[in-house]
Swiss-Prot record:
Sequence positions bearing N-acetylthreonine: T2
Domain notes: The PPIase activity is mainly due to the first PPIase FKBP-type domain (1-138 AA).
Positions carrying Phosphothreonine: T143
Pfam families documented for this protein: FKBP_C (PF00254), TPR_1 (PF00515), TPR_2 (PF07719)
Subunit structure: Homodimer. Interacts with GLMN. Associates with HSP90AA1 and HSP70 in steroid hormone receptor complexes. Also interacts with peroxisomal phytanoyl-CoA alpha-hydroxylase (PHYH). Interacts with NR3C1 and dynein. Interacts with HSF1 in the HSP90 complex. Associates with tubulin. Interacts with MAPT/TAU. Interacts (via TPR domain) with S100A1, S100A2 and S100A6; the interaction is Ca(2+) dependent. Interaction with S100A1 and S100A2 (but not with S100A6) leads to inhibition of FKBP4-HSP90 interaction. Interacts with dynein; causes partially NR3C1 transport to the nucleus.
Sites bearing Omega-N-methylarginine, chain numbering: R373
Keyword annotations: Acetylation, Chaperone, Cytoplasm, Cytoskeleton, Isomerase, Methylation, Microtubule, Mitochondrion, Nucleus, Phosphoprotein, Repeat, Rotamase, TPR repeat
PROSITE patterns: FKBP_PPIASE, TPR, TPR_REGION
Domain (PPIase FKBP-type) ranges: 50-138, 167-253
Designated name of the protein: Peptidyl-prolyl cis-trans isomerase FKBP4
GO molecular function, one term: peptidyl-prolyl cis-trans isomerase activity
An annotated GO BP: chaperone-mediated protein folding
Amino acid sequence: MTAEETKAAESGAQSAPLRLEGVDISPKQDEGVLKVIKREGTGTETPMIGDRVFVHYTGWLLDGTKFDSSLDRKDRFSFDLGKGEVIKAWDIAVATMKVGEVCHITCKPEYAYGLAGSPPKIPPNATLVFEVELFEFKGEDLTEEEDGGIIRRIRTRGEGYAKPNEGALVEVALEGYFKDQVFDRRELRFEVGEGESMDLPCGLEKAIQRMEKGEHSIVYLKPRYAFGSAGKEKFQIPPNAELKYEIHLKSFEKAKESWEMSSEEKLEQSTIVKERGTVYFKEGKYKQAVLQYKKIVSWLEYESSFSDEDAEKAQALRLASHLNLAMCHLKLQAFSAAIENCNKALELDSNNEKGLFRRGEAHLAVNDFDLARADFQKVLQLYPSNKAAKAQLVVCQQRIRKQLEKEKKLYANMFERLAEEETKAKATVAAGDQPADAEMRDEPKNDVAGGQPQVEAEA
């Protein structure tokens, strides 16, 4: 009998009426949730709001009737703490537990299933008793890929449901830690999306966008979402360092969403944002520049209420944004994105010099030499004085020639091997080394002077 089977058998042994006992841990101190520790846990940490917790439990009515047990199913139960996924008593009690702890929780109806109960096993207005064992807990993964790169643990819940969006003006207090040593302690006011200019890692901004006003959280960042392979000399952070931040979102003002803006506002803001993106580009902050240019595209791409004059301005801004995005992606070696933005630019202006040239550069970078050559040739056809295109076309021709020579050599070696194998096979046959069941027939004689059959000589 396994340990869990033994525990399951013991958990079903309750039959006598249960007593109300324990320490009152309800927020209102109304004896709605009573807790008795049956076995102490280890360490000092307890789960925080939003943590994923893993438990075993057994539940009884006050008369001793067991109504549910994860032990019977031999499957640990998990839920996100403080998110309302379980009864109130559980969110309250499990938040006080340590790993390895076993406790009994007595829950009054208002902290359990209330007047309705949970038919057919739990009657209306029922007081319940649970035995709960906590096995582990872990923070909330905020990454889209769920790769564990940004983990949040909420110390203090915020208010309301609103969260900062891209471009929101936020006010925060933060502390950054590397190996338990504080390297950054500041109070800041900035726009979401411009954190890099404030020496903040991208992962922290992503976490801020998931926070509520007044929330105080701990954020753990893997290198990819921190300062990456470059590190941060200003803070003496080495390459590929994992970081921890404690952050308090004091307040924020959401930026207007695209649908909330008039066409005039979109045009005005696009001009401002374009200048900001140019500043970031000149400073070598290409990721920040990308965010700015993407805003322009999102505001203007599907806007159809411009006057004729404003429509021309909007198209010029869109064209410039796609060209600048292509340049940023080339710098970031994101060549597919560069090609995509060049294509968008060329949809707006099919003979655009920069669009053709930058697409050629991106094709060249991914060894699509024929496509690159076609782009550079078109640039020279339209703009014969473009010296950079002439130089890149020469590079293309050299790469294509080198590739052809490599392929020629590869195929030559292949045919040479095949010829050698064929010669060996014929030599074997000539020596009489044939299968016993080989059909015997007259073969045409080779000319001694020629040394090889006519067919092979032609080959």
